[in-house]
Amino acid sequence: MEFYLSSDCASLARYVSKVVYLEDNDIAHIYDGELHIHCSKIGSEDFSFRTVQKLELELSKIKKGPYDNFMQKEIYEQCETTKNVMRGRVDAFTNRVVLGGLENWLTELRRAKRIIMIASKASFHSCLAARPIFEELMEVPVNVELALDFVDRNCCIFRNDVCIFVSRSGETTDTINALNYCIKKEAVTIGVVNCSGSSISRFTHCGVHTNTGPEKGIATTKSYTSQYIALVMIALWMSEDLVSKIERRKEIIQALTIVPSQIKEVLELEPLIIELCDKKLKQHDTFLLLGRGYQFASALEGASKMKEISYVHSESILTNELGHRVLAVASDNPPIIAFATKDAFSPKIASCIDQIIERKGNPIIICNKGHKIWEQDKQKGNVVTLEVPQTVDCLQGILNVIPLQLISYWLAIKKDIGVDLPRDSAMSAPDI
Amino acid sequence: MCGIFGYCNYLVERSRGEIIDTLVDGLQRLEYRGYDSTGIAIDGDEADSTFIYKQIGKVSALKEEITKQNPNRDVTFVSHCGIAHTRWATHGRPEQVNCHPQRSDPEDQFVVVHNGIITNFRELKTLLINKGYKFESDTDTECIAKLYLHLYNTNLQNGHDLDFHELTKLVLLELEGSYGLLCKSCHYPNEVIATRKGSPLLIGVKSEKKLKVDFVDVEFPEENAGQPEIPLKSNNKSFGLGPKKAREFEAGSQNANLLPIAANEFNLRHSQSRAFLSEDGSPTPVEFFVSSDAASVVKHTKKVLFLEDDDLAHIYDGELHIHRSRREVGASMTRSIQTLEMELAQIMKGPYDHFMQKEIYEQPESTFNTMRGRIDYENNKVILGGLKAWLPVVRRARRLIMIACGTSYHSCLATRAIFEELSDIPVSVELASDFLDRKCPVFRDDVCVFVSQSGETADTMLALNYCLERGALTVGIVNSVGSSISRVTHCGVHINAGPEIGVASTKAYTSQYIALVMFALSLSDDRVSKIDRRIEIIQGLKLIPGQIKQVLKLEPRIKKLCATELKDQKSLLLLGRGYQFAAALEGALKIKEISYMHSEGVLAGELKHGVLALVDENLPIIAFGTRDSLFPKVVSSIEQVTARKGHPIIICNENDEVWAQKSKSIDLQTLEVPQTVDCLQGLINIIPLQLMSYWLAVNKGIDVDFPRNLAKSVTVE
């Protein structure tokens, strides 16, 4: 008999496929080829047994394949991962979304008076990205909370609140603390995770698995887009019985089906981005990212990637907050990256970008293909454009974030930074 | 953003020099609002001619330009109208041709100054170019001037001699977006038009005689003779029919009027309001001052009238007429004349080098004033007259939504936790612009709190209108009497901070913070379980002014830090947790806007999610390490920083043993501030950051009170 003990299943995958998870306050005693589990506190556990589970991790999935770094591999996997999160769940013919993990809680979820989405960092950004579509489809207030701040504040939570916990690893300490808090307050809890058997997936009432596969790079890339789609699917699923939303739901579902191929198109921007990093961006150590509406989350996520991977101080700003102080910094010529894909706010975004151009800000604009509004400025060298396919406004952020992932990656490569193991960051943040 | 100023004198003799000085002085007082170019328009030497002077840069540059042009300053005018503008570029970079006033043609037939953004200006410009007009500038405002000329000429050709306000209505029909607008024309000598939509505008009235009434009637057109919709693109034939039909209807209406009493009543009200200056109807010397901000009017008169959106003010023959550019059911019939309370001396700098410094040092007084007469320290009570009648409704609210921009948003973040603690009502804090973009669901049992120093912030105003439409109860927390938000909300609290001239908000932040805390205390005053907490907070508030005075003594130390540790740095990280997260964000904002250093506020516990990658021995870090329930976790986060060779500056409480011990073994510095209740500590902790921003800017030789690209009141969205 052999036993392997680990804090993460990735290190076990090559040796075994059967595992037992310890709960809090468990004491495992291994001797004479036997495993004994004791409880350090009387009455603190409901369960009298621990099930042996089967690991599904494949060794090959953890290899880099033809890519130089895991991060690059995972960026390119987004064509498949976005497809996987929808597989068997989105039916484009009947325009329905099926989420088996939530089915038993349908009544409670649709009765929600308020939805609270709780997460940290990249998962927090995916919640921000999905928030407007929840509000639109369900017509209930939606709060997005940083898990840490949520717990610090001892927020008001009620029985008819629905709390959604988003975490790639399912082990993020702050998010788990928030989850325990909400369970105590009797709210209905949903987990959106990428690891089956993780704490959050086991403690929440119900949930959705993002089916993303292992993510080895520290910087979250494919998990972000998968979480984004999972959340949109939840919103579609919860709003299914509203007649007034039929057309909108149909529009979104049809657009979801072509997202994977559109991502493939965006990835073709890589040569242009490499050139851009070489010529324009490499020598800078401060960046500003501007987004509005659905694209504010894209700006936040992009800024986060650049901090983590390229070590540049980047900050995301709501485009229309320019007038509130941020423009003071713009004239010192930090590179400015602005999201200007088409949606309800396009004229206002164009106006803000005009103001930047007037101050010689020379922005990089992520816009849709065939968008002519900056053609003249482009000729004059005032702007650089990165063109992405157009999709429904609430899904555009999935495409828009990918150029930023590539920029972060290539900036790091150009600066000779270890991409997959950046200093001071961790995949799971279990400790405070 | 931009500033508008207009001056009209009627039967008051003024030399051209005096008129120029009045206009330029008006701009000087608006300079803090936006300042990359300035200009004025006055009557020329020949009848029906206009002089326009404009220049890039500050008001002082305009003075030099006028001196250079050397107009005859001794010519006197018994009646005159002049307009002026200070600009913040939104379309077209700062260049002389892009300065306002903008004109319709080389003969200066129509001259316009404009605040705001015309969102359909590209289409208008294309249309006008196709009709043969030649543009001199890249501005959206020039479209307005040329549109005036086009519509004037078209109507003239069709035999219609329109009144100035009638012509203006036709122009406004074509404009989309926001505007605060003044227009002057040689075709309407000694007349000026003022109108607004989304941008603030007020009119000051000055006369030797006592005002007869304190309101001006709004003049609505006859119901069945409303102005016709005349689209610009219609052909001449259909275009020409409109006004003629309007007159026919009007005549018919008069003939059909069989109710003499009603007619008399109308005439009486009409003449009464128009002649509000005169007892006997004889012409009276009068001066009008039109401005986008009361600060430029207060020197001349305290009697002011605020225009509403879609009001159209027409000043001529010593009279002020208010029309509506579009009719609304239930719209107010009058505009009241209010008395400003702002004193001139309050606006001046006093012994300080900059308004910002003055305002930082005023915080012991401004915080005291916010609380004065509202907190009873003996009985531990909070009395907010502006909210008193509405408190039971607020207590029953399903949700509180706090909506603001910039620094005001940070004051909401700072107080959110105490609201939730004291009221047990869920609280959302929203950036106004994002709130609008999302079309957030708002219900009748929501209470929406709008916080704005100026009371004119465009995004906050739009969000307010959005919430009113949905039946929510609205509360305003503002610092300006008579501002749009204070007049449109159901109830509110005035923060009594006094005028804030420096573009970076300092004393308004602390006053807003206190006003919000008082609001939260009011909500909880019927709860037994909150009594001890309320007493603790109220007694803590009592000490705040004195404690702020104490923190200000850190200035020499901070000045030195800025000259040594922080000099020549490009980036800065601020760490705060819990109540201090808002202080970190606000501190970062101050540093960004004043010293142009890229700084970011981070929740201390979020370090490990990426931000820690930035930490090394070179990056300056400021951390809030004052005592509260999260203190051990904050210490742990800071240890992670020092373990990676970071050497933070810790803002901690006086005589704190933990930091005293650590500073012996770790490379860190401390700034010691007094200790107070956790939910009030942010009031103390922000002061060192304000001073830091100020001295970083001064050491860089930056103009502290007028930072580039920024404006005091963001009135465009």
Curated annotation (Swiss-Prot), chain A:
InterPro entries cross-referenced by the UniProt entry: GlmS/AgaS_SIS, GlmS/FrlB_SIS, SIS_dom, SIS_dom_sf
Protein's GO biological process: chitin biosynthetic process; fructose 6-phosphate metabolic process; protein N-linked glycosylation; UDP-N-acetylglucosamine metabolic process
A GO molecular-function descriptor: glutamine-fructose-6-phosphate transaminase (isomerizing) activity
Phosphoprotein found in the keyword field: no
Domain SIS: start-end pairs: 105-244, 277-422
Any single Pfam family the record assigns to this protein: SIS
Key words, A-Z: Repeat
Protein name per Swiss-Prot or TrEMBL: Uncharacterized protein YMR085W
Originating species: Saccharomyces cerevisiae (strain ATCC 204508 / S288c) (Baker's yeast)
Lineage summary: Eukaryota, Fungi, Dikarya, Ascomycota, Saccharomycotina
Curated annotation (Swiss-Prot), chain B:
Pathway recorded for this protein: Nucleotide-sugar biosynthesis; UDP-N-acetyl-alpha-D-glucosamine biosynthesis; alpha-D-glucosamine 6-phosphate from D-fructose 6-phosphate: step 1/1
Any Pfam family: GATase_6
Domain spans labelled Glutamine amidotransferase type-2: 2-318
Chain positions found as Phosphoserine: 253, 336
Record field: transmembrane: none
Keyword presence, DNA-binding: no
Domain SIS: 390-529, 562-707
Keywords: Aminotransferase, Glutamine amidotransferase, Phosphoprotein, Repeat, Transferase
GO biological process, one term: chitin biosynthetic process
GO molecular function terms noted in the UniProt entry: carbohydrate derivative binding; glutamine-fructose-6-phosphate transaminase (isomerizing) activity
Taxonomy, superkingdom: Eukaryota
EC number(s) on file: 2.6.1.16
Induction: The activity of this enzyme increases in presence of mating pheromone (transcriptional regulation).
Active-site residues, as the UniProt record annotates them: 2
PANTHER family named among the record's database cross-references: GLUCOSAMINE--FRUCTOSE-6-PHOSPHATE AMINOTRANSFERASE, ISOMERIZING (PTHR10937), GLUTAMINE--FRUCTOSE-6-PHOSPHATE TRANSAMINASE (ISOMERIZING) (PTHR10937:SF0)
Anything else known: Present with 14300 molecules/cell in log phase SD medium.
Function summary: Involved in amino sugar synthesis (formation of chitin, supplies the amino sugars of asparagine-linked oligosaccharides of glycoproteins).
NCBIfam families, alphabetized: PRK00331.1
Name used for this protein in its record: Glutamine--fructose-6-phosphate aminotransferase [isomerizing]
Protein species of origin: Saccharomyces cerevisiae (strain ATCC 204508 / S288c)
